[in-house]
Amino acid sequence: IVLSFIDGETNITVNGEDVSKEIRSFEVNSNVSEISCIEGVRKILVKKQQEMGKNGGVVMEGRDITTVVYPNADVKIFLTAGIDERAERRAKEFSEKGTDVPIDKVKENLKNRDFIDSNREASPLKKAPDSIEVDTSNTTIEEQVKLILDQVKIIADKKRN
């Protein structure tokens, strides 16, 4: 497994094959929680993620980034949104990539993932106590970016002083 950055995007190759698009498919999304429960898989992925950011200056998203992968990160943001909003966004994402998935199916998938990921033993989905929660339910992407950048600036200013 090789993770690389090309034109601001994360590219993932497995045994030399680019799987960057496939990894975000509905089929993978429907099965990812079952695989992520396997402790050996978690250990390998956490190690890879930690290697990516060993020199700092990295922004990562994931369900255990602030609690397991980078528990000492300078800035920890915990994004939330209502299930209906999340389902709508994910269905739109799939549609833009050429796969139409009914919203009710996407919503059920998200609920299932949330339950499995929140209750797994290895690297469960939970909010780090020192993370900043940002509810994105009723905000545009531009507003979300501004909210997060404002928090980054506040933390950076505190570190300088």
Question: What is the role of each PLM region?
Answer:
Residues S20-N29, S36-K97:
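ATP-dependent NMP and nucleoside kinases share a basic, alpha-helical "lid"
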Residues I1-V2, S33, C37, K54, ...:
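Generic surface-pattern signal
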Residues S4-I6, Q49-N55, R63, V68, ...:
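Small-molecule kinase domains that catalyze NTP-dependent phosphoryl transfer to phosphate-bearing small molecules
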Residues I1-I12:
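Translation machinery proteins
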Residues T13-I23, N29, A91-K97, I116, ...:
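NTP-dependent small-molecule kinase module
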Residues E39-R42, R63, R86-R89, D104-E108, ...:
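Short, surface-exposed, polar/charged, turn-prone segments marking secondary-structure boundaries
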